[in-house]
A protein has these predicted regions:
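FIC/Doc superfamily catalytic core
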Residues: 1-196
């Protein structure tokens, strides 16, 4: 894809006002955007790794991680979306849904409701389902899951060993696994998360 705002069929397109939030004037193609976002994500990941051991199950951390991951590229990074989407909860419900999710995860951890992998994958799935940000929700949710599973003593996930922003078989498997989780079957997403 060369057009800057072309999206894969299964991705969430940006609204015109969200597109205006692009901070990098050198970004003119989809490849440029992917490169800029990946560089910003890498810096966000390094920042998050330095914070190991600190509480990540807060709404402030959810937003700050997104800002650290995408803040060099998008002015709205770290801000919840204000528009409707074909996926996710209504924009007005995002803060309450994120707070409920974080409460649920704290409960799961405290009471050993699920093993560490399943706890982190459930966090990932629910964050994607809420879809709190204009863009970057899958990448952000995968980072949150990796951070949580590491806090729980397990290695980070491989997520199919591929760049899931690229259209291809791995992305299709990931989307299918998310759809299975939507139907309360977590096994495909757990398997995919640990696959290389």
């Amino acid at each position: 894809m060369s057009d800057l705002f072309d999206e894969p069929d299964d991705a969430t397109p940006l609204e015109p006002e969200e597109r205006d939030g692009l901070l990098q004037s050198w970004v003119t193609t989809r490849a440029d955007l992917n490169e800029a976002e990946q560089a910003s994500i890498d810096k966000g990941a390094a920042w998050a790794r330095r914070r190991r051991g600190r509480d990540m199950l807060s709404e402030d951390f959810v937003r700050l991680l997104h800002k650290r991951m995408f803040g060099e590229v998008w002015a709205w990074a770290g801000s919840y979306r204000r528009t409707g989407r074909n996926i996710g909860v209504g924009a007005c419900r995002i803060p309450a849904e994120v707070a409920q999710l974080l409460d649920d995860v704290r409960y799961w951890v405290e009471h050993d409701t699920y093993d560490p992998d399943e706890t982190a994958v459930r966090l990932h799935h629910r964050l994607v389902a809420i879809h709190p940000f204009p863009n970057g929700n899958g990448r952000h949710a995968r980072m949150m899951a990796d951070l949580l599973v590491q806090q729980l003593g397990r290695p980070p996930f491989a997520w199919g060993g591929a760049d899931l922003t690229d259209i291809g078989e791995k992305r299709r498997r990931y989307i299918n696994a998310l759809q299975s989780a939507d139907r309360h079957d977590m096994a495909p997403l757990l398997t995919f998360a640990r696959s290389a």
